[in-house]
Amino acid sequence: MAVSCVERGYAETTVEEVIARAGISPEAFARHFNGIEDCGFAAINLIVAEIGAVASAAWSSDSSEAESVLLAIKALLELLAARPSFAPLIYIQGRYAMPADSYAPYRASIEVLASMVDRLRAYAADKDQAPKTAAAGVLGSAGMAMRRAILAGNIERLPELLPDIVYGVMVPFLGQKEALRYAGQARELLNEGG
């Protein structure tokens, strides 16, 4: 489903094409899905689950909240680069081309990620420095940078956005100096290849 959506767009993806790509019978498809919308919704849910898994796995009691956020962003970008059909489906097709219900899992995942990012507020010198909507705002900005890269055909280069996204996510909570420090750590991780 995801590959077909990337190649043809959701509107042009057919059950027949999905069946052919998956190598299954129409009966097998019908046992699992009530049509292309249902299949698309399942694909979105799968991607959201994988994003949640890699983001959660990045959190460690051995790391600070900010380091965990950095590692979660890194893991997300690496997942999307490694699974190139995921990024356009979740960030483009699922958001703009599929039925409105398909956007709900993405929105729910953003709320979970925003609550993770908002935990940085506890480490801010001025706890009221960032507005209440800062976490959602920085994730929206990160999503826009990712969508631009996806639309430009640079999915495999998504991990290169790590320093910029880390800076943008950290600055409202930790201030410029700390955000620059974590962006520098992100750049070092990229340069080390890990």
Label each region the model flagged.
Residues 78, 115, 119-122, 148-194:
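C-terminal peripheral helix-coil segments that are non-catalytic and often amphipathic
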Residues 4-38, 42:
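Helix-turn-helix
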Residues 15, 43-53:
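Short, basic, alpha-helical segments at the C-terminal edge of helix-turn-helix-like DNA-binding modules
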Residues 68, 80-100, 114-121, 147:
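Amphipathic alpha-helical segments used for helix-helix packing
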Residues 1-5, 29, 51, 76:
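Short hydrophobic clusters on alpha-helical segments that form packing/core surfaces
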Residues 98-123, 129-144, 159-168:
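Amphipathic alpha-helical packing segments from all-alpha helical-bundle domains
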